[in-house]
């Protein structure tokens, strides 16, 4: 697991996690960048680490806006990684 994927999983595992890619970018403190975050989340979705859902957007185009939630598999992978360093997911 690389640091960018780890950052996204940590942010999604918080008690009140950011769910939209733009919120993830903002809360990462500059670690996640705009174009790469969308590719990262799609790759993590393919691996089964996050679930992708859609919500109706109130914008002028009436499009659906994707949001992401960490899966059990993603949480287990994160906990396993943190255990190697003696850390616990709170």
What are these model-predicted stretches?
Residues 64-68:
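Short beta-strand micro-motifs in enzyme catalytic cores
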Residues 1-11:
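Short alpha-helical segments that sit at the start of domains
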């Amino acid at each position: 697991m690389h640091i960018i994927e780890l950052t996204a999983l940590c942010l999604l595992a918080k008690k009140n996690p950011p769910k939209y890619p733009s919120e993830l970018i903002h809360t990462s403190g500059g670690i996640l960048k705009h174009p790469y975050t969308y590719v990262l989340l799609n790759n993590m979705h393919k691996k089964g680490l996050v679930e992708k859902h859609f919500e109706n957007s109130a914008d002028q185009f009436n499009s659906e806006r994707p949001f992401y939630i960490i899966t059990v598999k993603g949480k287990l992978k994160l906990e396993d990684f943190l255990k190697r360093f003696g850390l616990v997911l709170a």
